[in-house]
């Protein structure tokens, strides 16, 4: 009897997996997105590997000029070389370009240096893809005396976006795409822990918990930014790439690590598939209606195919904190204080919002 029940469970689980892969993981149509990006300039953070690399590759093959904003310049140069080879193989009709530039989001000085350098080049910026993100176990403090995950995943992107708002405004229509995760639904905005950047109060938290918190911050920030940018020609959208094959499993407790790895291998998207949400958010022509949206599976299907396919609805909604004005304001004001945004910078940003 036990074997029969076990067999039935395995069979049922197999059917669920196959249905999920057939319905949710089926290829997304790109028929309705803009595939000729000639003259467009895009910055993709964390573009040396994973979703960021796949996003940059696709945009470059669609004739965009893509800047790989990376912490590790050696890895960035290798990614640049591979993309350039892809472009050469497409022949003279492909005019895409790829550049690599140093950006360490865990250093406020590096973020300022990158933004200042780009602004001095006096060229447009049509899309800023805030893709970089990671996870660390244990408490790591940056040179700015802030918790590493908090700064690298959220705060650095907050500062970068504010410093480039003037350029984005000059380049309208333009967009800011914040790559979040379904894990943001497990996060929370802890005013005590993150009010001073998250050090002592976060020392007892698991890395995966802190990662979820920062992914929530990405969504809340993107939503608040969309409200401030309304009517300017610059839109802000956050995206969930789906359950993507990554190295996050190594940070799980040993008791569930093997099970999570098995489940991931059965139902997870590849990084190429996971990049589709970012690519669609960056290139879909219906940019005005995208402002403030959180794009997960169903939203992407509606944009590209006119109808939702279904899926795990509970993971496709965004956290209620994104709709809470007080929490959005708290996060914005805290980030502005911790990044020491100058009066000049804030005034310039306000000019964009107004």
Identify the function of each model-found stretch.
Residues 2-26:
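Terminal signal-anchor or tail-anchor transmembrane helices
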Residues 9, 22-256, 340-349:
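Rossmann-fold NAD(P)H-dependent dehydrogenase/reductase core
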Residues 253-266:
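C-terminal lobe of the eukaryotic/viral protein kinase catalytic domain
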Residues 111, 263-315, 325-333, 337-338:
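C-terminal helical subdomain
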Residues 101, 282, 318-320:
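Membrane-embedded and extracytoplasmic architecture of multi-pass membrane proteins
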Residues 23-30, 268-274, 354:
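Low-complexity, charge- and small-residue-enriched intrinsically disordered regions
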Residues 238-240, 296-300, 348-354:
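C-terminal/domain-terminus segments
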Residues 6, 14, 322, 333-354:
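C-terminal helix/juxtamembrane-tail motif
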